[in-house]
């Protein structure tokens, strides 16, 4: 008993010294972490200025002195494996991390459909009960919305039926499939926050650098300045009080009373820049294999701007990590019925990004959306498509990993348009075995589009026509928020939405989102 108490006392001294001496290791480093294989990885933290920090890992020893209170070392990792121990020493302080694996690390970012937890999917319990994968781990970056926001520290969690419920469903299915295929440890760093715009994950410097982005910051600054010196805090406190009152209402009462809307300001996670500073920066520059991203719903009022803003965010992330053009795989928005936003324009922006930004690739998910629910509960298919994309584009496997993509258009003698598709795999198919294909429209020189009769011709061609359009010049496919689709390749991947025309976008010249309703002071 005395020995146990003495050991506890020594541990307590170390912990207190760790806290009081100013020596820390970045929060992302914990037991059960996964470090990127075959890479130069970075370990970092804080320590008293000029003090020596020693890092020991897998037979390597690195020593560095803290400069201006910060330290960072680099280590080499080899092939996938483990477990290892990582020791970090500063004076009398020593921190040891156990059960460290070497494998591939992916950062999963975006908004609610990436955040969507496994416990919420269809048949969740069946999946969770079998989610016993000791070599798959995930780390959820704490949801810190402003600098003084107090949040609990996170830790790497080993995937099991006990921990899987909070795993991002799409990231879970992705990592499970990659792990089974490659038999290596997979680590997922989760950063998504529901409802966030893409500019929430960028810097002020980036947004102020472009005339098409600058209005975002200027609009936000004008709102903040309109409150006066202490106006925002008063309004925010009023919102907190109103929200507390609202949460006391029963379900029937909530039918008639709107939920209070949080005022825009420095504590609102919808603000531009914020989460880049308080969440993303906490895991930079943790060495990665690549990025997984599912976002865009909150930018669907500004699809034209997204054509530049999304690539700019990708480039800024890559610059911040300092790993060159590492893979950036993302999911195109699915179908969703709405009359106030323009999902089809944002999908086009995503498609263009996949072609214009190096080492990016896109999963088509139109068919996986629920027209009536922005958060579809079936995520395994999207996760599988994302994993196939990684296997084909990142890991060099010879697999079909994308769906049919429009290549060229020719006119035929009977007034039809013949469309050629790339990525047809072993052939185009109508998934529901229908005689005609859904989602096509054609137009003449007047720009009026009419639903087209479309049929598959041969292995990789589709013939479209409408008798009302005698001289068709343009075709669109799934240029809608929501609708039916059935064009796939035989490998099960859906065709990419497209249009051949260059008509002006509805969202051109729109630089900020519509204003939300102002929250009231009381119920």
Question: Could you tell me what each predicted segment is?
Answer:
Residues 7-17:
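Bacterial N-terminal signal peptides
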Residues 6-7, 521:
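Short amphipathic alpha-helical "recognition" segments used for binding
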């Amino acid at each position: 008993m005395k020995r146990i108490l003495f050991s506890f006392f020594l541990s307590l001294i170390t912990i207190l010294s760790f806290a009081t001496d100013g020596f820390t290791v970045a929060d992302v480093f914990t037991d059960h972490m996964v470090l990127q294989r075959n890479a130069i990885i970075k370990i970092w933290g804080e320590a008293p200025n000029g003090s020596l920090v020693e890092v020991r890992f897998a037979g390597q020893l690195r020593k560095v002195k803290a400069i201006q209170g910060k330290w960072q070392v680099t280590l080499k990792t080899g092939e996938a494996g483990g477990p290892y121990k990582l020791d970090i020493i500063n004076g009398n302080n020593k921190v040891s991390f156990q059960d460290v694996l070497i494998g591939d690390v992916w950062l999963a970012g975006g908004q609610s459909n990436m955040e969507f937890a496994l416990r919420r999917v269809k048949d969740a319990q069946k999946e969770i009960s079998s989610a016993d994968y000791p070599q798959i781990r995930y780390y959820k970056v704490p949801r810190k919305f402003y600098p003084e926001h107090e949040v609990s520290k996170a830790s790497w969690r080993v995937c099991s039926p006990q921990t899987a419920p909070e795993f991002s469903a799409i990231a879970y299915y992705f990592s499970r499939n990659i792990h089974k295929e490659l038999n290596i440890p997979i680590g997922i760093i989760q950063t998504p926050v529901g409802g966030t715009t893409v500019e929430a994950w960028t810097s002020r410097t980036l947004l102020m650098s472009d005339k098409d982005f600058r209005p975002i910051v200027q609009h936000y600054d004008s709102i903040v300045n309109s409150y006066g010196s202490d106006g925002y805090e008063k309004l925010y406190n009023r919102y907190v009080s109103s929200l507390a009152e609202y949460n006391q209402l029963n379900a029937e009462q909530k039918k008639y009373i709107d939920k209070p809307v949080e005022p825009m300001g420095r504590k609102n996670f919808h603000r531009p820049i914020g989460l880049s500073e308080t969440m993303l920066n906490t895991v930079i520059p943790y060495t990665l294999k690549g990025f997984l991203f599912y976002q865009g719903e909150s930018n669907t009022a500004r699809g034209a701007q997204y054509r530049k803003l999304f690539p700019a965010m990708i480039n800024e992330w890559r610059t911040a990590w300092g790993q060159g053009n590492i893979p950036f795989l993302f999911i195109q928005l699915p179908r969703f019925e709405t009359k106030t936003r323009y999902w089809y324009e944002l999908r086009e922006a995503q498609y263009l990004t996949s072609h214009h930004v190096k080492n990016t690739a896109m999963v088509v998910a139109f068919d996986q959306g629920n027209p009536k629910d922005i958060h579809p509960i079936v995520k395994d298919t999207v996760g599988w498509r994302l994993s196939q994309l990684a296997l084909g584009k990142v890991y060099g496997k010879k697999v079909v990993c994308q769906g049919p993509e429009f290549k060229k258009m020719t006119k035929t003698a009977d007034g039809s348009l013949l469309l050629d598709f790339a990525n047809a795999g072993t052939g185009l198919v109508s998934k529901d075995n229908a005689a005609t294909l859904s989602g096509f429209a054609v137009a003449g020189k007047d720009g009026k589009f009419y639903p087209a009769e479309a049929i598959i011709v041969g292995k990789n061609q589709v013939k479209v026509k409408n008798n009302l359009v005698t001289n068709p010049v343009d075709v669109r496919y799934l240029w809608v928020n929501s609708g039916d689709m059935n064009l796939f390749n035989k490998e099960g991947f859906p065709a990419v939405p497209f249009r051949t025309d260059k008509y002006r976008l509805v969202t051109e010249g729109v630089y900020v989102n519509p204003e939300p309703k102002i929250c009231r002071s009381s119920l």
